[in-house]
Amino acid sequence: FMVEQDWCHKGLTDLVEVDSMHERKQRMADLSDAVIALPGGCGTLEELLEVITWKQLGLYLNPIVILNINGYFDPLLEMFRRAVDEHFMRPQHAALWTVASTPAEAVGLIFSEPVWDANIRKLALV
């Protein structure tokens, strides 16, 4: 659907077309070995929170790294801490992602973080 809007990169060697944003996110997750979230807007935040939720539910098991350049994600990370403090999330949920300050650190983390077990979904209960 992004091709119809002309929102696609024309210089790619392989362009995967899908019918919806949900299908796009699912396809990206299916093809990925890890997720690195770069600073961005609403779409970036939505995709990051969705993949964290999928990991919490055992639907996505690969590493998730938040690239917190210049503290960009500090407010989001504080919200996560508050969610734990107010018992909306378990303390173990903070291990669903890791945080990097530099691109090199982010790449290193995707290779050092373990793949999660699908039984992680038992932590989905608060």
Predicted regions: what they are:
Residues 25-26, 48, 56:
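Hydrophobic alpha-helical segments, especially transmembrane helices
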Residues 38, 52-78, 91-93:
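Short, acidic/small-residue loops that bind anionic groups at enzyme active sites
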Residues 32-43:
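A short, small-residue-rich loop immediately preceding and capping a beta-strand
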Residues 51-52, 113:
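Amphipathic, positively biased hydrophobic alpha-helical segments used for protein targeting
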Residues 1-31, 69-109, 114-126:
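A cross-family phosphate/adenosyl-ligand binding-site feature
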Residues 43-50:
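Short glycine/serine/threonine-rich phosphate/pyrophosphate-binding segments
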